[in-house]
Each structure stands twice: as C-alpha cells, then as structure tokens.
Regions:
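Canonical Rossmann dinucleotide-binding motif of NAD(H)/NADP(H)-dependent dehydrogenases/reductases
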Residues: 2-38
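Catalytic loop of short-chain dehydrogenase/reductase
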Residues: 13-22, 94-134, 138-179, 190-194, ...
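Aromatic pocket-lining residues of Rossmann-like dinucleotide-binding sites
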Residues: 28, 177, 233
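Conserved mid-core segment of classical short-chain dehydrogenase/reductases
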Residues: 52, 59-72, 76-115, 134, ...
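Short-chain dehydrogenase/reductase
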Residues: 75, 125, 129, 170-171, ...
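C-terminal helical subdomain
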Residues: 123, 186, 204-241, 246-250
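Rossmann-like NAD(H)/NADP(H) cofactor-binding core
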Residues: 143, 180, 185, 244
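Short, flexible catalytic-loop segment of classical short-chain dehydrogenase/reductase
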Residues: 184, 188-199
Length: 257
C-alpha cells in the first residue's frame, strides 16, 4: 500500500519532466493517488506531451489562476474528469516578469508587474484552495513550493518578495482552513535545474552557494527529494502539521557563512 492510497490530488503547473510538479505527480501516482494535472495557454501542448510518460496518463485541465472563470468552474471540471472529492492540492505556480522584476531590476520594477507577481505567485494559493474547497469535504492538504524568503537573494528580487508573501499567505490559510480539517504547508527547495530557474537572470549564482555551504550537499538536477517532501505532506503522515515550511535544501537554511 502507498501512503496516498485512495486519495485524489490536483497538481498544478506541470510543464516539463524536469519540473517539480511532474515528479510530484509521478510519485503521487506510485503511492496510490488518483492525479489530475493542470496548466494553461501555450504550455498546455507541452504538458500534454509530458504526461504521456505517466502511468496512468492523468487528465489535464486548463487552469490560469489569473482568470476568474477558470477558478469558478474548477470544481465542476474536476467532477467531469471523475474527481468528486479532492484530498490534496499542489500549488506549483509562480510568475514574475524576468525582464522587469528580476536580475537586479528591483528598484526599477513597474508597479503593475509587481502586482502581477504577488497576485499570481501568492494570492493564487488562496484562490486555488477556495476553488477546490467545495470538493474537500473530508479535509485535506494544500502544499505549495517556495524558495527561502527570509533573506534577499541576488537576482531573485520581486519574486523573492512574492515568495515571502506566499509564505505568509500559507500561514493565514492554515489559520482559516484548519477548523475544516484542511492543512496548508510549503516546501522550501534549494535551487533546481528547472525551466523556471532558467528564466531567472543570474540564477546560476545560487549553485555556487549551495555547492559550498549545504551540509548534506546539493544536487540541482535531482528534484526527487523535494517532490517526496510534497507527497509526504499530502499524506496522512502529518495530520497535526499546518502553517509549516519544510526545507529541502541540503540544510543550507540552518547554517551561517
């Protein structure tokens, strides 16, 4: 028996087989979960190709968290693909305009781009959870992905601010949904060689930091440890844990220079 036997899980933001979301979906299926995945726009075509590698091939829904109708219809569309109950939601959604809001552009970023970064990367945790809530009739687990937002990283800029907002948002979500048996936690991963990271100007600087300082070492090409942490938080192994940030970074967050 797997740790997710009988559970229904929505995994958002699955774009490529190097993405954390893909590995989460793969492991969740291996652990017994029924999985539905989502993406939107032009990325849907890539997602559809990638999920053919999963067994079974999960349903793919279009979900743009900046489109209200995508959210208001989500529960009905999940029912249409046979998911009448949701036990777990994986928030793998983030966006900041790399040309204007990252790579050293912190002081010059347009307000509209900052608004979009925070709305899509942080507020969407709430809007996604609330869209799924009608199907979370037996409680459940919401798990998001962050990158340690307690310090100012080079090049990360307004995405770092958005991640700080995400971390606070998860704590408030834990507070308000806890009485209904719904947990909200985040996994703070070290830098991984994903499409998202490649879009960040200057992100290669992270690799040297982790390579030199992480007590356990760090393999930026292995998203397995991060995905396993997400799956564990989706399971019943953490029934009294909410509002938490689990660090999967080789221990770097715990050490000084």
């Amino acid at each position: 028996m797997g740790i997710l036997d009988g559970k229904n899980v929505l995994v958002t933001g699955l774009t490529h087989n190097t993405s954390i979301a893909y590995e989460v979906a793969r492991i969740a299926q291996a652990e017994g979960a029924k999985v539905v995945v989502s993406n939107f726009g032009r990325a849907m075509r890539l997602s559809n190709r990638v999920i053919q590698k999963l067994e079974p091939v999960p349903p793919l829904l279009e979900l743009d968290v900046s489109e209200a109708d995508h959210l208001t219809t989500l529960a009905d569309r999940l029912r249409e693909v046979g998911m009448d109950r949701v036990d777990g939601v994986v928030h793998s959604i983030a966006f900041a305009n790399a040309a204007t809001s990252m790579g050293g552009k912190f002081l010059e970023a347009p307000g509209a781009d900052v608004d979009a970064a925070v709305r899509i990367s942080a507020y969407s945790l709430v809007s996604l959870a609330m869209a799924c809530k009608p199907l979370m009739t037996e409680g459940g687990s919401v798990v998001g992905l962050t990158f340690d937002a307690t310090v100012a990283w080079p090049a990360y800029d307004w995405m770092g601010v958005a991640k700080a907002a995400l971390e606070s948002t998860s704590r408030y979500l834990a507070r308000y949904l806890g009485p209904e048996g719904i947990r909200s936690n985040l996994v703070a991963a070290g830098p991984l060689e994903t499409i998202a990271k490649k879009a960040i100007p200057g992100a290669e600087a992270f690799n040297d930091v982790w390579g030199q300082r992480a007590p356990l070492g760090w393999d930026a090409k292995d998203n397995g440890p991060t995905a396993k942490a997400v799956v564990a938080l989706l399971s019943d192994f953490f029934p009294a844990t909410t509002g938490e940030i689990v660090h999967v970074d080789g221990g770097l967050h715990a050490v000084g220079a």
